[in-house]
Amino acid sequence: LKLFITGPTYIRDDVKEAAKLPEFGHRDAENDLRFVPIQENLIKLAGAGDKYVPALLLGSGSTSMEASVRSLVADDETILNVSVGAFGDMYYNIAASNGKKAENLKFDYGQAMDLNVLEDKLRVMKPDVVSFTHNETSTGVTNDMKAACELIRKHGAMPLVDGVSIFGGADIDLENSGAAIYCTATQKALALSAGFGIAFISEEAEEKAARVTNKGHHHDLTKHMDKARKHQTLTTPNTTLVNQMWFQLDRIVNEEGIQNRFDRHIEMRGMVEQWVDGLNGFEMFAPEGHRSVTMSSVVCPAGVTVAQLKGGVKEALRGEGYLMDPGYGKLNAALEKEGQRQIIRIGHMGDIMPDMLVEYLDALAVELNKL
């Protein structure tokens, strides 16, 4: 099946072949031949300059997010989470489940964070730390990371950012973002299998983590930084994925070109917008100016049901060789209960090419027009 979901994502054949490269010892000199270029290319892809060290954490994006909370929020501090969707809520739940003094500032699904509302909350709550989502996978909304971080710092708080579903598909200019830590993963726009959470850790974050207690072991950023500076992981990594990551990042940086990759994602967002304009009764869910370049959410006409999308459209497209995303389950269930219109999601991240997207959109349109 060709995956047009929002993760995991399509993996190129040559990246799959890289899995056949020889295994190696993660404490052996051979390890450096993989991890040094991996870290160098991650820094280039992030535009991180010399302000961040990328650390690879065994797990997924939520692993790095939990490490950010456990290592950067002291027991006597407060954390405000800003949510524009399901994965923003997850960041809050991570903090709450770890016993942090957390509050969740929620915005309506399909909307970006309102900085004026955020500033009002910052004035009243005076949190020590603020976490938020750069790109909300459940809704296709992208927040203005730089503006949010600037506002958060204006009020004396430390910004923690979840960039799981946008990193590798957009220019995040991390060096000038203001983020204390930027959390992402392998299985989205990097077009690799799941297996690593990636944390871009600033000196500021490292210094604070050294003062915070009760960090656990695998969520202790100071331990990860110690190994990252040696071009290693804290515990034994999936060396097959490391080989693929080494190959893929080199290909992105030195073959495709970073800016070309970013431009391709912008082009595909525009393709979806144009496609939606040609469908009767469908519209983009996210507001213009805050639409993700890696995935799109599309509002269906009134009367379309979850059952039609999951049992009808999705299964019809499966028969044609595509895995369709009928929308984020919890969100669509809530929308249906409230009598609101359903949304579908279209993943166009990583190594999905424009010609692949055209073919999929044509097939998807045929099925949607039957509703």
Regions found by a protein language model. Give the residues of each.
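Conserved active-site segment immediately N-terminal to the catalytic lysine
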Residues: 175-187
